[in-house]
Amino acid sequence: MKDVLDARRTELVVEYNGKDITRSLADSLVDFTYNDAAPGSLDDIQLSLEDRLQNWQGPWSPSAGDTIKAEIRTFGWNYPEEEQKLPCGTFEVDSFDFGGPPDTVSIKAVSLPVDSGIRQEKRTKAWENVTLRTLAGDVARAAGLTLFYSADVDPSYERLEQTDQSDLGFLNEQAMKEGIAVKVSEGQLVLFDEAEYEKKDPALTLVRGEDAVASHKFGWSTAYTAYRACEVTYSDSTKNKTYQAMYVPPGAPAEGPVLKINEQVDSEAAAMRLAAKSLREKNKEAGKASLSLSGDVRMASGVTLLLQGWNRFDGKYLIESASHKVGSGGYTTDIEIRKVLGW
């Protein structure tokens, strides 16, 4: 095993505006971070570079919207002659910082086109007789993105009110109520059903004391006590009608706190759907943890894994976000995870 560890090597491959700058970057790289963000947040990459020759603060100085494509490659990571790749994607530069001494620069790029207004421009608009997929399609087109909708359900609405919100923020809000996650990746606006991802077989197993877990953090708090059920009640004064629904998940205890929601719905079915999805969203907070590992290209948002050896915290988890870092400390991966709900 020591020979394998000694032979380990990591390479960062970078294209800037379509030009391969891997070699010229190697001598000045301090560290590189790829954040595969949780749903609702943008993926990003960050480059920290030594700049004693003043190239990055001078002739190479980035401009907003410049494209950076990055890939992490590992060699001999688990056995001799093994090669693995983690394509991080293509990003657009949205910030640049320069400081010193010694002179260093930091370049950050995000997965959303920086000239798109869907993230920052606030709008007020009424959406009538619309489905979630149609709403997402409109937002995608406005940003120059392709819609990838991976969910069996496509909720419909008589009317939605967008009030002083960005298009992306409004879409995130509506999707979250339906238990559907939103991400922007590789020119796509992606919507997927988190519950379906939870059902997938674990992609890998981490065993305490056997796998390369450098540190771990688990815990619980009464502030995040799981609710046993959710009740939705809404009185529609225009129709003189009250909609009510109670959702109790399989295996719920006979006693415990009930989450109560008073939010606009237009049918009993919509009330039940809101109750189930709201309970999922709330109870996700009760089983969160974080792990720091030796670099692992398998770690990605949406992947399920099995933990063994952490006693009461053992079980199946979903990766919410993964941060991959390459630098003087080698290649490391940090993940934020939550226990799957199972319903």
Language-model-detected regions and their locations in the chain:
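Short solvent-exposed strand/turn elements
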Residues: 104-119, 331-343
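Soluble periplasmic/extracytoplasmic beta-strand elements of cell-envelope proteins
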Residues: 46-48, 69-71, 90-94, 106-110, ...
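Amphipathic, non-transmembrane alpha-helical segments in extracytoplasmic/periplasmic proteins
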Residues: 45-48, 109, 123-148, 162-185, ...
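Assembly/oligomerization scaffold segments
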Residues: 1-114
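Solvent-exposed coil/turn segments that connect beta secondary-structure elements
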Residues: 17-19, 50-52, 73-75, 92-101, ...
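An acidic/polar, Gly/Ser/Thr-rich interaction patch typically located in mid-to-C-terminal regions
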Residues: 32-63, 211-343
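Short beta-strand-centered interaction patches in the first periplasmic/extracellular domains
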Residues: 2, 104-107, 111-115, 149-214
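Short, compositionally biased
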Residues: 82-98, 125, 195-198, 318-331
